Amino acid sequence: MEAERVVFEGFEGLHLVADVRGDPEATPVLFLHGGGQTRYAWGSTAETVAAQGWRTVTLDLRGHGDSDWAPNQDYSFTAFCADCVAVADQLGQPPVLVGASLGGMSAMLAEG
C-alpha cells in the first residue's frame, strides 16, 4: 500500500513529517518510533495494519528523520508529548497510539 507523505504542525509550530496509509475515514493509528529512529521503523507494521482497515500514521518525531529540529533545543518528554497531542488533534478523530521506547513514553504521557 502506497504511503502519502504528510506534514503536520507540532507543538510550537514545528513541521513533523509522517507517512499516512489506509482509508481516510478509518480510525487512525499513530505510530511513534524510539530515539534515534525514524518513521520507517514502523513501515511494514503500518502497511499490515492499514491492510486490516485502519488509517495508519507513522511520524518522524522532532529532531528525527525529515521532521524539524527544535530551534530552542527542547527535546523533553513534555515536548514530545505535546507534539503527539498536536498531531492527534489534526487527525479528525482520536487515534490509537502505538509507541516504542521514546515514542512509547510520549504516547503514555499523551494518554495521561
Named regions from a protein language model:
Residues G104-G112:
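Short glycine-enriched nucleophile-adjacent loop
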Residues G43, V85, M108-L109:
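Short, hydrophobic alpha-helix immediately C-terminal to the catalytic nucleophile
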Residues G36, L102-M105:
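Short beta->alpha connector loops
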Residues F11, A51, L61-V98, L102:
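Active-site loop/oxyanion-hole signature of alpha/beta-hydrolase fold enzymes
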Residues G43-S44, N72-Y75, G112:
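N-terminal low-complexity, intrinsically disordered patches enriched in charged
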Residues M1-V29, A51-W54, G92-P94:
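Alpha/beta-hydrolase fold catalytic core
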Residues R21-D66:
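Conserved HGGG/HGGXW glycine-rich cap/lid loop of the alpha/beta-hydrolase fold
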